[in-house]
């Protein structure tokens, strides 16, 4: 929305960036219908209540053999209650009611997208695209009936209307090759749309370390771009893995929310420390095979990662 120059069609067509990649805007209307704590579908009284779990509801005697040996309570996944409303007195979960709500919400979501796209077409001379990305954990984890909602929404959209069809960003670009060129404005889908979730007093300490590691990754990639040595190649690949894992936005997010502060801080430190040790070894061209193998055993994400991208 705030790119330079401003996008002609707002968030409803992609734009190309000077570096080449296309950017798509996240649709706010469809996002609000699923994510909003006040008006989103997942808060319907008929749906299963995520927080009411027998691990906290039942007596320790009833939970013998289910909880840890020390008796500490935890989520078990067995939840007998529905959301009901803003009350501690929760009604029992009724699967039929929940499926009825999912069906109604799927129909409403379908008709909302149909009307939205019809309205957009009346103001645009190109095909609009509505991009609706969501965290996968919303469907089934936080919103137990979420997978059924998706199933019903897709079926209704295919069989009950013809105003829109499903596509992917890649397919849309293949069908529509010409787009506006702009420089995107920094933004996120976090609180207020910018960076305050990932950069404040709770997590700001990580960024000097991440920036140093990023510079060092580029330094070593350029210094050894032509290497044929297997050990150096493996070490540089593992450095790239450790850097990517340290840069995961989950760690800063968890530090901000406080839900797993110590774990998130430890993960960040561990990846940075392993990266730094590998950096020192690569710089000296003296890689410790045992240490490298241990790092690869711990984290082997992206087995074919090309560290030369950092050149």
Language model features with spans:
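Active-site and substrate-binding clefts of carbohydrate-active enzymes
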Residues: 3-311
């Amino acid at each position: 929305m705030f790119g330079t120059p401003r996008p002609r069609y707002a968030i409803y067509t992609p734009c190309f960036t000077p570096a080449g990649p296309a950017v798509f805007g996240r649709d706010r209307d469809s996002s609000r219908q699923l994510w909003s704590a006040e008006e989103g579908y997942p808060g319907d009284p008929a749906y299963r209540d995520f927080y009411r779990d027998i691990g906290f509801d039942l007596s320790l005697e009833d939970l013998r053999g289910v909880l840890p040996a020390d008796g500490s309570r935890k989520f078990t996944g067995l939840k007998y209650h529905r959301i009901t409303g803003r009350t501690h007195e929760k009604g029992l979960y009724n699967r039929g009611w929940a499926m009825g709500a999912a069906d109604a919400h799927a129909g409403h979501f379908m008709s909302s997208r149909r009307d939205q796209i019809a309205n957009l077409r009346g103001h645009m001379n190109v095909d609009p695209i509505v991009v609706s990305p969501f965290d996968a954990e919303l469907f089934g984890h936080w919103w137990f009936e979420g997978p059924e909602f998706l199933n019903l929404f897709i079926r209704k959209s295919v069989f009950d209307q013809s105003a829109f069809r499903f596509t992917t960003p890649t397919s849309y670009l293949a069908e529509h090759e010409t787009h506006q060129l702009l420089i995107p404005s920094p933004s996120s889908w976090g609180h207020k749309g910018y960076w305050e979730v990932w950069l404040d007093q709770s997590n700001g300490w990580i960024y000097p370390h991440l920036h140093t590691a990023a510079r060092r990754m580029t330094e070593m990639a350029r210094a050894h771009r032509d290497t044929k040595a297997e050990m150096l190649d493996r070490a540089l690949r593992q450095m790239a893995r450790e850097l990517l894992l340290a840069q995961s936005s989950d760690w800063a997010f968890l530090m901000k929310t406080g839900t797993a502060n110590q774990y998130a801080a430890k993960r960040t430190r561990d990846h940075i420390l392993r990266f730094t040790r590998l950096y020192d070894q690569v710089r000296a061209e003296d890689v410790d095979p045992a240490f490298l193998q241990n790092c690869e055993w711990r984290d082997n994400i992206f087995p074919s990662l090309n560290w030369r991208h950092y050149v």
